[in-house]
């Protein structure tokens, strides 16, 4: 079974979850979300894809998961992202991590995150939809 942690299930996070639910692979999705509205929206989007899918659980905080996570997606605002990354690096065992949107709010946090990822021998993938800017 594939174990996945999604931190933040707002608009983009819930779309990631929809894509995961579409996969035919057996999976369990751990979802960290504090907003009631986002939780309801995420459940609706899950059920729109597969009304029988129940292999997910919501948390208010990053959970301690005793199994290795195959994938972590951090889809929050950039402000708390470094703190979230530090918590994940100290409490979770994982294979792959995706950072959504603008990674961090400034270059200092970006460089600190880069250093932490290197120290922990982890590679982060950045999903940034604005790949080209025309001036």
Describe each region flagged by the PLM:
Residues 48-57, 119-123:
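A short helix-to-beta-strand connector/capping loop
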Residues 16, 20, 39-43, 84-88, ...:
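Hydrophobic packing residues within well-ordered alpha-helices of enzyme cores
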Residues 104-135:
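A contiguous active-site-proximal alpha/beta segment in oxidoreductase catalytic domains
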